[in-house]
Amino acid sequence: MARDVANVWWAMFGFSVVVLLVVSALWIYAMLRRPRTHTAEEAKRINRRWIIGGGLILPTVTIIALLAFGIPTGRGMLPLPVEGEQPLRIQVIGHQWWWEVRYPESGVVTANQFILPVDRPVDVEVTSADVIHSFWVPRLGGKLDMVPGRTNTLRVQASQSGIFRGQCSEFCGSQHAHMILHVEALEADAFASWIETRRELQHQPPSGDAGRVFAERCGQCHRVTGVSEGNRAPDLSDLATRPTLGAGVIANDADGLRRWLSDHQSLKHGNAMPRHDDIPEETLGQLADWLETLAP
């Protein structure tokens, strides 16, 4: 679908270049030519010719050409009935400044990553939990606004496996630029395996002080299957498999995880997670070690 959108763009670009060249050539011709004297009848005929050609024929041809390219492309992004395998539903909810991604058919929930199968249409149902966001993965197709209290649907389809970048394309606050979505298209078997491993995830809570801190603070907002049921912040059940933290702010490795826990406000100022200045570094380290185990 992204290829179709690109084709429309290139067609519009090519036509715009032609118009620019024609207008420039006419302007140069008008500047250089010698003025001629026309009778009233000749002047009227010339004006009529420009009105018909430039005011009627050219716009009509242009609009017909754009519609011929644009309507089929736009139709492909609508959630219309299809023959064969039915579209997969994926719900994406925008938050300041992270992505909640749900697979209602399997009950899988993740955050800041959008995994989809290759060669199968996907209906992306988007909405927002706070302000207006916009779902946009350039390599997959068009963009669609995420409006609080309203669900919009965009159909996308990946033609090959790979990793792509998604981005919120509607200004949504101070960290708008740091609202990145990791998108990965998997072959059908790999996608089915990905869903199955997430559906079966069950974790054990951390021990000692780390367990107490997680239960008293983290678990009130974050969900970890088998441990906590918080629903106000990103689901952490498969945190260790994600390439970044904070929706693209920092790499998800041992050092990045510790930096995020101890100083996340300097990394992504204004995010909703409170500071942990009163928690000893040793306890934060234990908590980070446990978070690194959250994977299938």
Where are these regions (language model features)?
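Extracytoplasmic entry segments of secretory-pathway proteins
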Residues: 1-118, 199, 296
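Inter-heme linker and motif-flanking segments adjacent to c-type heme-binding CXXCH motifs
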Residues: 174, 178, 203, 220, ...
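Sequence/structural segment immediately N-terminal to covalent heme-attachment motifs in c-type
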Residues: 203-224, 236
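Short Fe-S-cluster ligation motifs
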Residues: 198-209, 248-262
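Axial heme c-ligation environment in periplasmic c-type cytochrome domains
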Residues: 176-179, 229-239, 260-294
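Conserved hydrophobic/aromatic "anchor" residues
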Residues: 164, 214, 290-291
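Membrane-embedded segments
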Residues: 88, 96-102, 110-187
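Gly/Gly-Pro-rich "capping" loops immediately C-terminal to redox-active cysteine motifs
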Residues: 157, 180-189, 223-258
